[in-house]
Amino acid sequence: MAEQALDKIFIRDLRMRCVLGIYQEERREKQDVDINIVLEADLSQACRTDRIEDTVDYKAVKKEVIAMVEESQFYLVERLAERIAEICLKPPEVERVSVRVAKPGALRFARTVEIEIQREKEST
């Protein structure tokens, strides 16, 4: 029997500021980071009932991500992406998440550098 495909919720183009980088000059002040998140969950119940209780509260996820990013400091974009993924996997409905973090201006002659990770809940 084929596994049921999961539905997707996209949170696109969150622009925030945080201390991010390994070099002293990067750590003096907050820098822009652009974040894109894809939450994967079975949304079929919410499609039938039209009730917020039956879906992922993506506003709550966004608020927690923003609070964490703005209050934290990171050396690596990879670590920032991992912390965001951990938050996104907290709601019981979310099975998988994809997180893309862009650091504009990180490389000379490049508009941005991006890291994308995928994580899923561990089987219990």
Regions found by a protein language model. Give the residues of each.
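N-terminal, polar/charged subdomain of small-to-medium soluble alpha/beta proteins
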Residues: 1-124
